[in-house]
């Protein structure tokens, strides 16, 4: 089971378009939110995540990939805030939509 803390059924502003400049790269928000993990099936070898935004299709014309990551230890119970940038927890990260020239022309993986 995976859960994230919400404020009024939404992620905190610091993780989205209202993020501070310190949490932006090339104008885009890049701070990942904390993810709580429970009840991982016994015998699991690793964990993976895909944070994909289907609501972006009408705006950008394609599904926005915010974060892809794998090889989390199956005993992980918390992926801490900003782990995508800080490397606070061991994992292998994939390319997100910031790498796509269809997004905004940047090749920075954020």
Predicted regions and their residues:
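N-terminus-centered regions that define maturation/targeting leaders and the start
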Residues: 1-110
